[in-house]
């Protein structure tokens, strides 16, 4: 059976991006002729969850932001291939492309590896937030590859909430009322996106055996006297439960999708999100972060 491929691209008016799309489309047209694959192209702004159902491969063209936003629609059964359309290697104004395993120059060879099972399959965990409303409805927020923010929708106002977490072996049971700038949660692979920019973590490393089950937590700009272990920062596998005392709050997944809640809602954050099968071709994602792993 021929492969069914969805290509999602970042829509802009940059010539470098247009050239990348031309190279990608040309390579795929050859595979349509030689292998009989089926392809569909759609802009990020037009894509729907239903577009991803039944696909054998999803190709995301753009940068890390494009990939993390699109990955929210992809379940655990569909491999994703990222193509950096404007690599920083070629232009200092380009994209770093941390999650992007391919580029226009290597795409023709890489996509064949992906179809033939020769790519590196990075099986990555994702954060999941579940909101229970005051009327008992349950809302699952989009899974986050990098990070989740839970805060007041008005960033100039403090976030008021109750924070709870069971003992995790490092910290005892947590049950605290806090006023902060919101709570940030990060996966191990996502900590470089935002978390390390607001936390002092110089030299901190993590056990390799815990990176699939644990996540990072911080209460942003928490008062100094409240910065107790586990309440201010944590590296934990236990779910965190937040009970809102805010008129309006929201969960933001990877800086993209927002899910709103009101006072009295509970938000449970854990590593129970669907895993993401991200394909790379020259190195594993985890190899890029070896300096943050205990040896």
Predicted features and spans:
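Catalytic core of DAGKc-family lipid kinases
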Residues: 86-183
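Gly/Ser/Thr-rich active-site loops/lids in small-molecule metabolic enzymes
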Residues: 173-225
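N-terminal glycine-/serine-/threonine-rich phosphate-binding loop
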Residues: 1-79, 114-119
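Beta-strand-loop-alpha-helix segment that lines the small-molecule cofactor/substrate pocket
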Residues: 77-89
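ATP/nucleoside-binding phosphotransfer catalytic cores, i.e., glycine-rich phosphate-binding loops
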Residues: 150, 167-170, 226-295
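Short glycine-rich anion-binding loops that position phosphate/pyrophosphate groups of nucleotides
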Residues: 63-66, 86, 188-192
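Solvent-exposed alpha-helices and their adjacent loops that cap or buttress functional pockets
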Residues: 50-53, 72-75, 119-122, 137-142, ...
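Short, solvent-exposed amphipathic alpha-helical segments in soluble enzyme
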Residues: 22-24, 74-76, 199-204, 231-234, ...
């Amino acid at each position: 059976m021929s492969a069914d491929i969805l290509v999602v691209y970042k829509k802009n008016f940059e010539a470098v991006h247009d050239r990348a799309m031309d190279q990608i489309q040309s390579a795929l047209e050859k595979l349509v002729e030689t292998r009989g694959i089926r392809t569909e192209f759609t802009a990020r702004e037009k894509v729907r969850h239903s577009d991803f159902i039944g696909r054998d491969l999803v190709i995301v063209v753009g940068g890390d932001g494009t990939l993390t936003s699109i990955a929210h629609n992809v379940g655990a059964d569909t491999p994703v291939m990222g193509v950096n359309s404007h690599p920083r290697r070629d232009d200092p104004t380009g994209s770093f492309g941390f999650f992007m395993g391919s580029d226009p120059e290597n795409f023709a060879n890489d996509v064949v590896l992906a179809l033939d099972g020769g790519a590196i399959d990075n099986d990555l965990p994702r954060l999941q937030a579940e909101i229970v409303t005051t009327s008992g409805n349950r809302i699952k927020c989009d899974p986050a590859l990098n990070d989740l923010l839970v805060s007041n929708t008005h960033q100039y106002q403090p976030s008021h909430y109750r924070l709870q977490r069971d003992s995790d072996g490092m910290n005892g049971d947590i049950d605290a009322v806090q006023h902060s700038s919101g709570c940030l949660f990060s996966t191990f692979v996502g900590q470089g996106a935002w978390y390390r920019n607001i936390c002092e973590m110089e030299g901190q490393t993590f056990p390799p055996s815990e990176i699939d089950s644990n996540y990072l937590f911080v209460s942003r700009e928490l008062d100094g006297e409240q910065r107790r272990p586990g309440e201010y920062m944590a590296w934990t596998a236990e779910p965190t439960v937040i009970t809102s005392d805010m008129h309006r709050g929201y969960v933001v997944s990877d800086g993209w999708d927002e899910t709103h809640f009101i006072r009295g809602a509970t938000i449970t954050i854990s590593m129970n999100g669907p895993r993401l099968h991200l394909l790379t071709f020259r190195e594993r994602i985890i190899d890029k972060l070896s300096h943050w792993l205990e040896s």
